[in-house]
């Protein structure tokens, strides 16, 4: 969940009496050491003020007058972490406050082709598997397991569904009914989400990303990011999907998290620069692995699994292409037959 924004909001309001919450929208992008903030409102504002406070302590709050600026870029060292908000003054002298967000400057994991990995979404996690990266469930995995993997020198990626409603998740009651659509073809308990409604969906996904930070995950695997190619129950376009997937990548990077593009092969040309690696299921079975090569050409790892083919049917070609593929059971337990 978002880390005590109401506490910071109260402090900002105390520091600036008469401040009103408003449609003023603040957006952050983080790339390496560089943080860029931009803001806009649906009505004229001026005399902007930037507020920032250390994350997660929230104190002290600092303010910087920005005049008419609506965009600001700064470079900060690794380890820097701040809450940020802006306010602006309308034609009647009323000051309006933006949303409050935060960022971390952290060295993001960028795996190169050939990186070894393990994918296990069941309990208990087998810590003895020899792999550089472990991809495990965000909700089900205790923080202590993540710490144990770190002690073994492993990178930990945390899985969650970014495009479907899962009724068994602890945050399921928070999902509004109006954004819950049709069931998935092979997973009838799951239902597609209306990814066009970022106003409702973004806070829920931000909370999951914040949980990943709290648990110590090095990155995230957002699943089900291809609703536009499925019967979701909503008129989701390819442009809607690109917007949502780009937002996910930016929100992860803003928190210092590595993020992978799961499947969504047809949008790789538009998204390869936004994501740090790719994860695919069964591209050899469907004869579509060539679509993943832009990640390899960009020096980024392509992780993948086959469920039905034998190793002999896909490993030689996977290795030739520079992919990190393995054979797995459908239930994604600890068992694996890697190609490396």
Locations of the language-model features?
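Glycan-processing catalytic domains of CAZymes
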Residues: 106-340
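Sec/Tat signal peptide C-region and signal peptidase I cleavage site
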Residues: 16-20
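Bacterial N-terminal signal peptides
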Residues: 5-14
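Recognizes extended acidic, P/S/T-rich segments that occur
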Residues: 47-79, 91-99
């Amino acid at each position: 969940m978002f880390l005590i924004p109401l506490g910071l909001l109260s402090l900002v309001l105390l520091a600036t009496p008469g401040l009103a919450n408003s449609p003023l929208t603040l957006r952050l992008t983080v790339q390496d050491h560089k943080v860029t903030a931009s803001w806009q409102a649906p009505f004229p504002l001026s005399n902007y003020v930037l507020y920032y406070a250390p994350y997660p302590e929230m104190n002290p709050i600092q303010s910087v007058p920005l005049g008419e600026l609506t965009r600001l870029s700064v470079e900060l060292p690794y380890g820097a972490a701040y809450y940020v908000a802006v306010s602006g003054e309308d034609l009647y002298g009323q000051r309006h406050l933006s949303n409050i967000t935060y960022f971390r400057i952290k060295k993001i994991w960028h795996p190169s082709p050939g990186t070894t990995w393990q994918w296990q979404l069941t309990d208990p996690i087998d810590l003895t598997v020899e792999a550089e990266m472990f991809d495990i469930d965000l909700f089900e995995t205790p923080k202590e397991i993540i710490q144990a993997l770190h002690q073994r020198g492993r990178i930990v990626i945390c899985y969650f569904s970014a495009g479907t409603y899962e009724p068994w998740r602890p945050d399921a009651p928070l999902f509004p009914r109006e954004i819950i659509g049709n069931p998935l073809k092979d997973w009838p308990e799951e239902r597609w989400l209306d990814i066009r409604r970022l106003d409702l969906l973004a806070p829920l996904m931000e909370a999951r990303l914040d949980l990943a930070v709290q648990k110590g995950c090095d990155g995230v695997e957002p699943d089900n990011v291809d609703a536009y190619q499925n019967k979701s129950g909503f008129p989701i376009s390819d442009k809607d999907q690109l917007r949502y997937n780009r937002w996910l990548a930016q929100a992860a990077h803003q928190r210092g998290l590595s993020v992978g593009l799961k499947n969504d092969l047809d949008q790789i040309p538009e998204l390869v620069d936004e994501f740090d690696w790719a994860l695919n299921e069964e591209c050899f079975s469907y004869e579509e692995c060539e679509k993943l090569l832009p990640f390899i050409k960009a020096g980024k790892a392509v992780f993948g699994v086959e469920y039905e083919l034998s190793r002999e049917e896909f490993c030689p070609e996977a290795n030739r292409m520079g992919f990190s593929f393995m054979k797995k059971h459908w239930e994604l337990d600890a068992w694996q037959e890697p190609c490396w």
